Amino acid sequence: MSEPHRVQFTSLPGSLNPAFLKKSRKEEAGAGEQHQDCEPAAAAVRITLTLFEPDHKRCPEFFYPELVKNIRGKVKGLQPGDKKKDLSDPFNDEEKERHKVEALARKFEEKYGGKKRRKDRIQDLIDMGYGYDESDSFIDNSEAYDELVPASLTTKYGGFYINSGTLQFRQASESEDDFIKEKKKKSPKKRKLKEGGEKIKKKKKDDTYDKEKKSKKSKFSKAGFTALNASKEKKKKKYSGALSVKEMLKKFQKEKEAQKKREEEHKPVAVPSAEAQGLRELEGASDPLLSLFGSTSDNDLLQAATAMDSLTDLDLEHLLSESPEGSPFRDMDDGSDSLGVGLDQEFRQPSSLPEGLPAPLEKRVKELAQAARAAEGESRQKFFTQDINGILLDIEAQTRELSSQVRSGVYAYLASFLPCSKDALLKRARKLHLYEQGGRLKEPLQKLKEAIGRAMPEQMAKYQDECQAHTQAKVAKMLEEEKDKEQRDRICSDEEEDEEKGGRRIMGPRKKFQWNDEIRELLCQVVKIKLESQDLERNNKAQAWEDCVKGFLDAEVKPLWPKGWMQARTLFKESRRGHGHLTSILAKKKVMAPSKIKVKESSTKPDKKVSVPSGQIGGPIALPSDHQTGGLSIGASSRELPSQASGGLANPPPVNLEDSLDEDLIRNPASSVEAVSKELAALNSRAAGNSEFTLPAPSKAPAEKVGGVLCTEEKRNFAKPSPSAPPPASSLQSPLNFLAEQALALGQSSQEKKPESSGYKELSCQAPLNKGLPEVHQSKAKHHSLPRTSHGPQVAVPVPGPQVKVFHAGTQQQKNFTPPSPFANKLQGPKASPTQCHRSLLQLVKTAAKGQGFHPSAPATSGGLSASSSSSHKTPASSSSALSHPAKPHSVSSAGSSYKNNPFASSISKHGVSSGSSSSGGTPVQSSVSGSLVPGIQPPSVGQATSRPVPSSAGKKMPVSQKLTLVAPPGGPNGDSSGGTQGVAKLLTSPSLKPSAVSSVTSSTSLSKGASGTVLLAGSSLMASPYKSSSPKLSGAMSSNSLGIITPVPIPVHVLSFSADSSAKAGVSKDAIVTGPAPGSFHHGLGHSLLAGLHSSPPHAAPLPHAAVPTHIPQSLPGASQLHGKGPAVPRKL
């Protein structure tokens, strides 16, 4: 370890000066002394604290900084002149401020100190009300007891008791007077601190108080003031609870007796009666009614009661109006009863009982009055016992049968005995009645509940079975949709897939309760009892009753059923028998309101009603098409207006189609195929010799929607498409040629005879009609779950009525077309003049344009079918009479054959949709196609176009039963027109009871350059009786629009006849298939060959029936004909 460092001392050289050493020592010593002098003052301060016992006034409290400061001040103050120096020192502001605060504190303590003031409190409270204006009407001193208590008396325990009972007095003792005098003597001394004004005021108070005491001693007699005081106190107490005058008088009597007892005990100084009476008069001025009761004797009270009786009602009301607010007298009933109600029997007799009351009621009233007398003096709660309530309820039930005046009189009579007013009695009786009526409902409600309990198990079991079946069907449907989805993915666009999802939702079975007579009867009984118990005002309207019934059914009756099985509106409807007499006003209004037909569309489009003018069907119809589509759908012609009848009837009122179809069947039983054959023969004979047949120039409107319809029909009705084998071209060749020659010859002659009908071409009157229909068609056709339905909308025209309904095949959607009057049945009446048809057509265009929002767009040429159909917009205006709409892309050429991007070189000139059963009188609707209708379009392969037949849906209830199916037979494989366009027409004659052929077109219309379409459309109306008288008109009609456009395409097409159920009772109808190769163009005798072919059914077509079949047999189908066949000529069930 190292040694610690040591400081080495250094010796100073030489010796130090001793004087220096002394001086330094002295300085150090002096400095030490000074330090010791001041240090104890700063560091060691001794403070002596004196503690004392704390009390409610003070407690020991010390502030250390202040104590140290005070001690230092004392130390400084030891020197003489320090204090003066401090105060005079201009820099000693702190000390000056402290002195100022101390002086101010002393001043406030002297002025506001509380020690002396506490002794003054009782004296300050002697007269708290001093200073109020006694003449102020707002201040009521009538009940100030200190004015009534004489100086010789004081309250039993001292002070005043407000609203706590009658005051009890005792003689004031001398000691109390001495105490008061002592207080008075002390009071001036205590007021020395107060200002002069306050002293004067207090002196005045004392003087007035002494004067009052003296005056009270001299004026008051105990008998007078005690009675008044008691009654007044009682009156004030009654404000909180309304007491009757009767009770008040009883209390008054008791107070009088108590007062007599006190008089005997105390024997106060008697006061002259004159002075007492004067006091009573003065006191009575403040309350006129109490002045009547202010007497001190029984005689005076009796006199007061007599005076009350003598008062008139007006005087009494006047007195009541002067009484203070809240007075119990204001609780009286009407003037006639006001005072008599509460007076005792000794003062007033009760109001008389009305005369003519039923004996049982009068007996009950007397029983109640007797019970009231027996229970006199009891409170209201104690009085109304169970027996009393029973009597009152019986009286209430009997008085309900009487008039309101008699009823009021009975209750007024009862109120004079009972401890309540008439109104209170009426309310109590009403409540008792309602409560009793509520008890009556328990038994019927229990019976209803039991009946429901008996009926529910069976219905719930049935519902469970339905749910199970629905679940199974849903699973099966999902499996089926999975299969269909693959095909849709190939065919439909994504957008269409999304649209279809919205419409495929299927609701499960509903919980619908099946009513029986027992439950319905019990429900009506419950409602009747409820209404009887309701105490609604007599003048209430039906709305109040309806609300009452609905609320009752919803709250009390509906819960009797299991949850979800019953609705309040159903209960209201089923129980109408029970409440109809009260709610009938509203019910009648509701019945009168027209019911709206709701059309459920998957695309949620609103209903569209198009009013079709009368002559619409008769005239030719141009096809305003905005978009040119590759394919031309001929199915549209037979689909859109299967039974378009233009009539000459005056203006039959629009009738419902469902109601009129059977009538049509009865009225037109004579239309038969034989008659049609005769007409055809006549037409053929007239047309003989006409060699030239020239079609009028086609209209400029490009046919756009027709092909779209075909594609849409195919792609939407392919739930389970099975390609049908195309018939060999050779088999169809010769009959078609034969038919075409006949039709052309006939058309030529018709054209010459009736050229003016060509003026109807270019009229797009069918467009408005079709405009709304494609939407239905598109939206409705999407239900793939339905078996192959022909989704083409149809217009069924009943013969007697002009109302046209479009029945949607799959979903029974219908759109009402109410044509004007001229639209009549031409099969029975004379034909309409050309001008009439022309006007009606124009009117149709206008009306449809208004109702449907007709907005044609510029013709956009979408070359291929895929192009036009991909534009999925639905343009209602662009659809012509064929109801064609821009269909979604459906690969008619799915195998790869694509249509060339060429617009239609020529459009359909007169695209009158001549449905097979067009019943347009003189001018059958024709749809004609020019030779080069679809130039440069490659036809799809044989199996493609025809794999999915496009059913032109026949109307569900169509007056004209014959259908014509137009099909284009297969042609050259490359779309050549060398072989000539082959058309197949199938005339579906009157449908039989079960199957009836529904015209179906499954042709994808593609036409090569120069290929001419065969024109073939002859409905039953075409061959009906009107043609006898309208040969000239028929010629023009045939040339322009009588002949339907058959897809003049050399594409393999299958003739499919779909059966439709018919309500007709005729025999089985045979389908007439008219086939034959069409010539290269329409310029060769097509009309003649067509009509002749129709008459002489070809070998492979079903022979025309010769049995008399009515022309207008409505097809009673749920919607339109549902086509779910898998091959050609396969009957389909609808």
UniProtKB/Swiss-Prot annotation:
Modified residues (N6-acetyllysine): K222
Result for mutant: F138E: Strongly diminishes interaction with HIRA
Entry GO CC: bicellular tight junction; centriolar satellite; nuclear body; nucleoplasm; nucleus; PML body
GO biological processes: chromatin organization; nucleosome assembly
Intracellular or extracellular location(s): Nucleus, Nucleoplasm; Nucleus, PML body; Cell junction, Tight junction
UniProt organism field: Homo sapiens
MF (Gene Ontology): DNA binding
Stated family: Belongs to the ubinuclein family.
Identification of the protein by name: Ubinuclein-1
Skewed-composition ranges (Gly residues): 973-982
Function: Acts as a novel regulator of senescence. Involved in the formation of senescence-associated heterochromatin foci (SAHF), which represses expression of proliferation-promoting genes. Binds to proliferation-promoting genes. May be required for replication-independent chromatin assembly.
Annotated stretches, region: Disordered: 1-38, 78-98, 171-220, 253-282, 321-358, 480-504, 594-660, 712-836, 852-986, 1093-1134
Biased composition (Basic residues): 182-193
Tissue: Ubiquitous. Also expressed in numerous tumors and cancer cell lines.
Post-translational modification Phosphoserine, affected residues: S173, S175, S323, S336, S338, S493, S660, S677, S1025
Bias kind Basic and acidic residues: ranges: 25-38, 81-98, 194-213, 253-268, 480-493, 598-610
Polar residues bias spans: 892-905, 941-950
Modified residues (Phosphothreonine): T166
Organism ancestry: Eukaryota, Metazoa, Chordata, Craniata, Vertebrata
Coiled-coil features, chain-numbered ranges: 479-542
Taxonomic superkingdom: Eukaryota
Gene name per UniProt: UBN1
Assembly behavior: Component of a complex that includes at least ASF1A, CABIN1, HIRA, histone H3.3 and UBN1. Interacts with HIRA (via WD repeat domain); the interaction is direct. Interacts with ASF1A, CEBPA, TJP1, TJP2 and TJP3.
